[in-house]
Amino acid sequence: MKLVLIFLIINFLLIINCENLIKVLDVRLAQTHIIPIEGKTWNLKNKTQHMSIIGNRRALLLASFEDLNKSYYVSIWLDNKIIGSLELKDPSQLPQTEDNGERYSTKHHSVLLPKEWIRPNMKIKFTLTESKDNSSLNIDSSNFFYPDVSQDYTLKMWTLPFYLFGANDTNTQPFSVTNGIGSEITKELMERWSCSDIIAVNHPIQRIDWPYLVMEPRNGNPAMLITNSDQKKDGYAIMNGVLNILTEIREAFGESTSSIQIYSPLLHLGANGKYTNPGGGLGGGSRGTGDHKYTFTFFHEQGHAMGLPHAGEAFAAGSYPYVNGSLLGSEWGYDANHNELLGTFIPPTSDQFKNCRRNSVFDSKGRCVKQSVMQGGAGDYSSKYRYSMFADFEMTTIQNYFKNSIYYDQTKGTYKKWNDTSKSYFEYIPSTKNNGLWGLDDGTPIERDIEVYTILFTYSTVGPKELSQIYPILKSSKGNLMKRYDPTNKNDMKLITPGSGSWYCFASGCDYTVRVTFDDDSLEHILLRQGKRKYWNPMGDFKENLYNATSSNSFILRGINVKATKSIKKVELLETLMAWKGISNATVLVSKDF
């Protein structure tokens, strides 16, 4: 009899609950953009792109109800337990639009959810009274809603200023200005980039001060050594050279497969001995360079660093959804620092507003629509801001950039990767892929946070001699060390000899070795995964154009780290053809005493 009574009571409560179910018309969450709670998906060129909510980042909850006149509460659930509850503000208190522009909505209640609540597998329920227990049978409640919350990740960025051709703190900008982006800039970047947090600090190398730069063959021009910025053959030549150096630094520090970014402010002198502006920027592959101001050039190039193309070109190719690289059709943005919504139209205090009708896309109300930051829209922002906004679609590229990276967990001393199916990190053990063809241990270091010297050098097969240089050595108090092979060690050579199962020398051969002499006359030999051979032929013919001055095959730029336990007396680049056969007949190609 008691069981029957309990059954009837439960069914009665369910009927009441169904009759009193709060009717919710729309639920959205806003971080960089206001998107549906289930995320947003695009299908372009037979490729599906999806934008999720980022975990461990605060989010503005917007909800519209059939009855606008009631007060509502939201409860956040995780593992079938309430982790928090808040009262929603009525629609009149929805955050304002930048520059007091048109309101986003007059129907949405809203509340800012703390970052600790934004986690995978969270659930949302709306009620008319505050929920303080874990009962899901509250009268006057809604169904559950299930936000698509994905990876939480911290964007780490190094800044590494380049002072070139005599540039210094006095005749250009002081290191205190160029060495980092500052907390206020970081706060605004957090509102524009899809990430949980940002750590932006000066690189362990601190800065690079070089009187010259060796430019690789480029655009039909041979390699050349330059000592002032006016000697460059094209506007991007120096910036391209800097990016190539950053590639070597990232690899030497074991960061090539990480999501760690690096940006280098470029300060150099012209032929007149005065500062010359770089005249733009260049970025890609987790690297960027440009001027020292950390404004639109920096913002644009770091978009490239995370994999974003120029939006106009992408639209023309069918891989960007909004006309001419604009934001027409993109969701509105949100800035939690200012607690205001960002329309997709150019605000009146923007420098671009006055003349925007000359070349803008217009919305249905005749307003000038913002362009993507990646297509000339870097200035389409309210005067209170430093940066404009990306399109919602571009956040998918940024999110994927982080999903595909390897992360080092400093607290555990282990690596991890993200599983987008389970919505969780898993411990990852780096391994050597493709038998070492493209490197060892997923490009991760074998030692961390030790004092290192970074040695960067160039070599030209055709000369003149000045093109083969060992740059001034750089020292870091906290650097990383990569696994390497010593060509004087027979056991090491057995591991990479062609035919042993290793493909370490199959990309272009193993024909070069760096020899470092320390102040106690001890030696260290580091075999480079670099050679003169054709692909997949480590003992065969030399590459085409190996001795063509205008071909990149005639030029080498490489960088390595070595332990800084002793001072360096000399660095040499040796020609060690098929090094696994022995290097007793090595030829010294480049040598420099320190």
UniProtKB/Swiss-Prot annotation:
Keywords: Hydrolase, Metal-binding, Metalloprotease, Protease, Secreted, Signal, Zinc. Disulfide bonds: none annotated. Pfam families: Peptidase_M66. It is an enzyme of class 3 (hydrolase). Residues 147-408 form the Peptidase M66 domain. Residues 1-18 form the signal peptide. GO terms for biological process: proteolysis. Zn(2+) binds at H300, H304, H310. The keyword Glycosyltransferase does not apply. GO terms for molecular function: metal ion binding; metalloendopeptidase activity. SUPFAM superfamilies: Metalloproteases ('zincins'), catalytic domain (SSF55486). Its cofactor is Zn(2+). It is found in: Secreted. It comes from the Eukaryota. The active site is at E301. Its EC number is 3.4.24.-. GO terms for cellular component: extracellular region. Binds 1 zinc ion per subunit. Belongs to the dictomallein family. This is Dictomallein-4. It comes from Dictyostelium discoideum (Social amoeba). The gene is dtmlD.
